[in-house]
Each structure stands twice: as C-alpha cells, then as structure tokens.
C-alpha cells in the first residue's frame, strides 16, 4: 500500500511542474 501511495505522489510531483512549465511555454508562444 505504501509503495502505491509513494508512486502516485511521485507521478504528481513530476506531472504538476511539467504541466505548469508546458502551460507557461504555450502562453508565451501564443503571445508572440
């Protein structure tokens, strides 16, 4: 059970920053 929770947390820790960076880059490209 602990490994599943840790794995899910790790996925979120990776996806959230990637999503934020991706969104910022898209907004920057659209701005131009």
Swiss-Prot record:
GO MF, one annotated term: electron transfer activity
A GO biological-process term: photosynthesis
Bilayer topology: Single-pass membrane protein
Pfam families found in the cross-reference section: PetM
Subcellular location: Cellular thylakoid membrane
Keyword hit for Cell cycle: no
GO cellular component, one term: cytochrome b6f complex
InterPro entries registered for this protein in UniProt: PetM_cyt_b6/f_cplx_su7
Function summary: Component of the cytochrome b6-f complex, which mediates electron transfer between photosystem II (PSII) and photosystem I (PSI), cyclic electron flow around PSI, and state transitions.
Keywords annotated in UniProt: Electron transport, Membrane, Photosynthesis, Thylakoid, Transmembrane, Transmembrane helix, Transport
Assembly notes: The 4 large subunits of the cytochrome b6-f complex are cytochrome b6, subunit IV (17 kDa polypeptide, PetD), cytochrome f and the Rieske protein, while the 4 small subunits are PetG, PetL, PetM and PetN. The complex functions as a dimer.
Similarity comment: family membership: Belongs to the PetM family.
Protein name, per record: Cytochrome b6-f complex subunit 7
Residues annotated as signal peptide: none
Transmembrane spans: 9-27
NCBIfam families: PRK11876.1-2 (NF008826)
Native source organism of the sequence: Prochlorococcus marinus (strain MIT 9211)
């Amino acid at each position: 059970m602990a490994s599943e929770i840790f794995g899910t947390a790790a996925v979120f820790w990776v996806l959230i920053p990637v999503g934020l960076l991706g969104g910022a880059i898209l907004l920057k490209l659209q701005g131009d």
